[in-house]
């Protein structure tokens, strides 16, 4: 028979009834029946054809409306499990047509597979796209699980290797520390702390210096009369300077007086004045008393000569020890100086009358008389 491939495959999938028209007692398909009928038409009798209820079998499997409608190509369905396993190649069709034993085996397997639709199809049949998609998804899930496990394992391996590396580094560092001697701890001082120390030391030194200055100023205040009432340092210093200048003027005045009183006596007045000025507790009257004692030891001829000598009122005496020239009339007009001299000589005369033994020092005098 000349049939299309689709029709032939469809007939191969359609099962026969419970009775085999060939009398073998095995179930088969319509395709097998038609193939045998075409090859050996004499084997099939009209009685067997009548007993073969084709319409009933078709009506059980497929609904009939307006004639027989064969199911479409099995590849168009979602899966091959609805119809069981089937041969897909022409070689399987030819072998099934030639070998009746293989046909009976195939019919038995198709029947069992049709009853057990959930079983996996066996043979050379193609897998359905749904099963392939399921297997692919399962493989992907398993791959993801495996990948995640592999990632976890790799992370664990990396962590373990890092720990091992850290332990190795620590062991190396410990060995190096053991090899090197421990350094002494260094005392680090902040810059601000150093500046604070410097300022503290500077302030202490400044305080000590100011204390010394204040002590010396108090000593000067005690020496200068009337200086204790002054509070300001500048004013106090001015007062001390004025007092020292006044003392200097007094010393100059006394030296000039001595030069005018005894102009012809050349004794070591400078040495006596220096020794008298060095002694701090000696007063002016004591110095004059020493000078008077030296005059008493002079011979009586000096006094007689002095009385007979004329008074040089208008003459100027040469300066002694570099003092300024002064005139005698102006000098003797000073009442204060005359009173001081009279008081000194009066004290000397009283002491001479009371004390016969004089304790005055007798300096060596070199008297020179002018003709």
UniProtKB/Swiss-Prot annotation:
<dbReference type="InterPro" id="IPR011598">
    <property type="entry name" value="bHLH_dom"/>
</dbReference>
<keyword id="KW-0539">Nucleus</keyword>
<feature type="compositionally biased region" description="Polar residues">
    <location>
        <begin position="85"/>
        <end position="96"/>
    </location>
</feature>
<dbReference type="GO" id="GO:0046983">
    <property type="term" value="F:protein dimerization activity"/>
</dbReference>
<feature type="compositionally biased region" description="Basic and acidic residues">
    <location>
        <begin position="165"/>
        <end position="190"/>
    </location>
</feature>
<feature type="domain" description="bHLH">
    <location>
        <begin position="197"/>
        <end position="247"/>
    </location>
</feature>
<keyword id="KW-0805">Transcription regulation</keyword>
<comment type="subunit">
    <text>Homodimer. Interacts with IBH1.</text>
</comment>
<keyword id="KW-0238">DNA-binding</keyword>
<dbReference type="GO" id="GO:0003700">
    <property type="term" value="F:DNA-binding transcription factor activity"/>
</dbReference>
<feature type="region of interest" description="Disordered">
    <location>
        <begin position="352"/>
        <end position="371"/>
    </location>
</feature>
<dbReference type="GO" id="GO:0006355">
    <property type="term" value="P:regulation of DNA-templated transcription"/>
</dbReference>
<dbReference type="GO" id="GO:0000976">
    <property type="term" value="F:transcription cis-regulatory region binding"/>
</dbReference>
<keyword id="KW-0804">Transcription</keyword>
<dbReference type="GO" id="GO:0005634">
    <property type="term" value="C:nucleus"/>
</dbReference>
<dbReference type="InterPro" id="IPR036638">
    <property type="entry name" value="HLH_DNA-bd_sf"/>
</dbReference>
<feature type="region of interest" description="Disordered">
    <location>
        <begin position="1"/>
        <end position="25"/>
    </location>
</feature>
<feature type="compositionally biased region" description="Low complexity">
    <location>
        <begin position="128"/>
        <end position="142"/>
    </location>
</feature>
<dbReference type="InterPro" id="IPR024097">
    <property type="entry name" value="bHLH_ZIP_TF"/>
</dbReference>
<dbReference type="Pfam" id="PF00010">
    <property type="entry name" value="HLH"/>
</dbReference>
<protein>
    <recommendedName>
        <fullName>Transcription factor bHLH77</fullName>
    </recommendedName>
</protein>
<feature type="region of interest" description="Disordered">
    <location>
        <begin position="65"/>
        <end position="206"/>
    </location>
</feature>
